[in-house]
A protein has these predicted regions:
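Gram-negative (and chloroplast) outer-membrane scaffold detector with strong preference
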Residues: 49-113, 135, 160-163
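Residues that define the transmembrane beta-barrel architecture of outer-membrane proteins
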Residues: 31, 44-48, 75-80, 95-97, ...
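Outer-membrane beta-barrel "beta-signal"
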Residues: 149-163
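An anionic, turn-rich surface loop/hairpin at beta-sheet edges
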Residues: 104-128
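Short, exposed beta-strand-loop hairpins at the edges of beta-sheets
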Residues: 141-148
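Cleavable N-terminal export/targeting peptides
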Residues: 1-30, 162-163
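Extracellular loop and loop/strand-boundary signature of outer-membrane beta-barrel proteins
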Residues: 36-37, 69-71, 112-117, 141
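Residue-level detector of the transmembrane beta-barrel scaffold of outer-membrane proteins
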Residues: 32-36, 62-66, 96-100, 138-140, ...
Length: 163
């Protein structure tokens, strides 16, 4: 069960992502802030997060560190991702294929009857696959491995260019 504070956080994150979506400009080779949200499987949760994308490094590569929080399935997760992303433009369509991955640090806290237990720190890795449009919209799938690292995350978000 998700607490009221978890619902408030999710609503605020969705509101801010929507606000940024309407004020966003073209997200290309500049650095950007990315707002994302979605669901995960194993554990079954909803999540919201933010990440920073570096300017292009050596052509197609970017470093994308990020943080997100997941709620549900008797568990609260805080994930810290450090991804190396490679981008492949798909012709003149404005769409780009994203692939990458990297290490994940997860902080897990049980809720419900085990709420009194301490937080646990775990490490793992993840692989990212997705698509991004030049206007900033993106969708991605993340496959993870390791203790308490979500096995599959499906999310959408918006990228806002930093000038």
């Amino acid at each position: 069960m998700v607490t009221r504070s978890g619902h408030r956080f999710a609503l605020v994150a969705v509101f801010l992502a929507g606000l940024m979506a309407f004020s966003a400009t073209r997200a290309s080779a500049q650095s950007s802030i990315n707002f994302t949200g979605g669901g995960s499987i194993d554990p079954e949760q909803v999540y919201a997060g933010v990440s920073w994308s570096s300017p292009d490094l050596g052509g197609r590569f970017q470093v994308r560190p990020g943080i997100d929080g997941g709620f549900g399935d008797g568990l609260r997760l805080g994930n810290i991702n450090i991804d190396l992303i490679v981008k492949f433009p798909l012709g003149t369509s404005g769409w780009t294929l994203l692939q990458g991955g990297g290490p994940v640090i997860t902080i897990a806290k049980f809720t419900g009857e085990f709420e009194d237990s301490s937080s646990e720190l775990h490490a793992g890795g993840s692989y990212l696959f997705g698509f991004q449009h030049d206007n900033g919209f993106f969708a991605d799938f993340r496959v993870g491995g390791g203790n308490f690292v979500p096995q599959l995350k499906i999310g959408v978000g918006w990228s806002v260019e930093i000038k």
